[in-house]
Amino acid sequence: MVELLAPAGNLPMVEAVVRGGADAIYVGPRGWSRRRDRYELTDEDVREAIGIAHERGVKLRVAINTNMQSHEIPAMVEKMERFVGWGVDGAIMTDIGAIAEVHRRFPHLTIHASIGANILNDEDVRFYRSIGVRQVVADTKLTLKELASRKEQIDVGIEILIHANKCYTYLGKCWMSPYHRLERTTDPFGKDLFKGSPNRGGLDYRVCLEAWELYSGETRWEEAVALKNDAFFLLEDIPHLIDLGVHCLKVQGREYPVALVEDMVRFYRDLIDAYLRHPEGRPFDLTPWGAHLARIEAERNVARSDGTRLLLIEARQPVPAS
């Protein structure tokens, strides 16, 4: 049975996606995931979220998917000890050293390789499998044929983003935001936070969506150039992904309004269930679902545009003197 994995950037969103029909939820501990702190949870919030999810038969995973320096590993392990003690169902991670250490200390914990790991080929998957990963998030650029080949050849769960964005580079490997603006702070526990780098506990300013001017020497060739960073919803591919045997369909959106995320999750819950109920061998009509998704997409586009506008304003501010 395919799993529907939903985001939660706060406790009300945990409640909302449970109502929406999520099979599993992921949250980010403050300072350790690829979002700004307002969309992350304190440790006590994580504990409460685990309780809310488990009470309703829903799994909860923590995204600890930043890259780490050596001095941060002990604090991460201490945090994971708490989460495991509270019954967390899995960890979503990127840093290979951190993955290996978590697997060594908690061998029964399911570890998922984050989209930030930027896994592109079968050898990448085999490597992550060798250090303890049991499920990988497929890059958004992979085709259905490539996914089918990977699933057949490697004993690992496949996770697909059904609402996310397609970066003009590769998710997890873009340095444009921190190159443009990088502000370093340290939290009370010694965790480094680099505002401007989602890979280091900060945020992505989305400066690729700024209105750039294109020059060749002194000649301006084009103005108001926006690099490709499109958000998307999958619809037509959902039946094919289910038939392929993909293990998990993942919705991104911890930064969106709670009501919008609940609508997104409920839409996909209803779509998945309807497809699983329909008679095998008969065509599945996606037409009625398109209009519903168009409404959700319009609301998402407004929320994303507002968020991007505020991020770009922030990106233009000077970094405070240290």
What are these regions (language model features)?
Residues 1-117, 145-250, 254-322:
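Active-site pocket-lining/capping segments in soluble small-molecule metabolic enzymes
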Residues 132-133:
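As written
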Residues 139-141:
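Output/docking surface of receiver
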Residues 121-123:
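Conserved nucleotide-cofactor-binding alpha/beta core module
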